[in-house]
Amino acid sequence: KETAAAKFRRQHMDSGSSSSSNSNYCNQMMKRRRMTHGRCKPVNTFVHESLADVKAVCSQKNITCKNGQPNCYQSNSTMNITDCRETGSSKYPNCAYKTSQKQKYITVACEGNPYVPVHFDGSVLLPATSTQAQAPLARGQ
């Protein structure tokens, strides 16, 4: 059976490539990575950074996951990612996706030993602050 870490790599890692010039990238990759089997996965993100860089996020900024779990981490820097989103005309088995290339901070959930990403929790343009009520000059202390 596919481990959670292997599933994360299959669904979210595409190191050393980018989708920049290819509007068909998501249609090809979603199929190739088996996310259109049985149904169309509505939204998926591919990360175009090294696996080592993405694994390193597990030791970066600890934040709460969208589902309330405490084991999410946000990257210290932006990463080159591609968002794939199902189009309105997409109908299984002919899944169709819109490809959007972005530079964003990513959030992943990590678990296991070694501690590795097992779930992609989202991406943001601006990093989360550890506490919302932080004084503006509290950085770098």
Swiss-Prot record:
GO terms for cellular component: extracellular region. Residues 15-24 have a biased composition (Low complexity). Disulfide bonds join C26-C84, C40-C95, C58-C110, C65-C72. GO terms for molecular function: endonuclease activity; nucleic acid binding; RNA nuclease activity. Substrate binds at K7, R10, K41, P42, V43, N44, T45, K66, R85. This is Brain ribonuclease. PANTHER family: RIBONUCLEASE, RIBONUCLEASE PANCREATIC. InterPro entries: RNaseA, RNaseA-like_dom_sf, RNaseA_AS, RNaseA_domain. The keyword Glycoprotein applies. It comes from the Eukaryota. Its main location: secreted.
